[in-house]
């Protein structure tokens, strides 16, 4: 007999840094998911990724308290900020894009860097080839105030 699906949830967790403290612990605990089991499984699956990179994760949980997780690649904005070399600013000490995209340019990247980002994100994008993926990432770059040269 198949497991009975109870629900699913989305979390963005830094790679290799899942721990029982907030926000991960309470979000899982109130749904009856074994927190330590999840943290160990997540950290094992993300050990090959860059540590600290935000990983969007879809967690599906079942009536018998078991779960499955689908870990996606970090957001395009993470790769773009890293490639552009944006420095952390503001209260939360995080890198930021332009306040008025289209009028203001905060940084620039090369088309080679754009291609590398598109190739890394290809598995999560609904693009048929790398050229289409590059156009999607280019749109994200423009909306952040990052110019693509070359």
Curated annotation (Swiss-Prot):
Pfam families: Ribosomal_L11, Ribosomal_L11_N. One or more lysine residues are methylated. GO terms for molecular function: large ribosomal subunit rRNA binding; structural constituent of ribosome. Belongs to the universal ribosomal protein uL11 family. SMART domains: RL11. Keywords: Methylation, Ribonucleoprotein, Ribosomal protein, RNA-binding, rRNA-binding. It comes from the Bacteria. Gene3D superfamilies: Ribosomal protein L11, C-terminal domain, Ribosomal protein L11/L12, N-terminal domain. This is Large ribosomal subunit protein uL11. It comes from Jannaschia sp. (strain CCS1). Part of the ribosomal stalk of the 50S ribosomal subunit. Interacts with L10 and the large rRNA to form the base of the stalk. L10 forms an elongated spine to which L12 dimers bind in a sequential fashion forming a multimeric L10(L12)X complex. InterPro entries: Ribosomal_uL11 (IPR000911), Ribosomal_uL11_bac-typ (IPR006519), Ribosomal_uL11_C (IPR020783), Ribosomal_uL11_C_sf (IPR036769), Ribosomal_uL11_CS (IPR020785), Ribosomal_uL11_N (IPR020784), Ribosomal_uL11_N_sf (IPR036796). GO terms for biological process: translation. Forms part of the ribosomal stalk which helps the ribosome interact with GTP-bound translation factors. One of its GO terms (cellular component) is cytosolic large ribosomal subunit. Coiled coil: none annotated. PANTHER family: 60S RIBOSOMAL PROTEIN L12, LARGE RIBOSOMAL SUBUNIT PROTEIN UL11M.
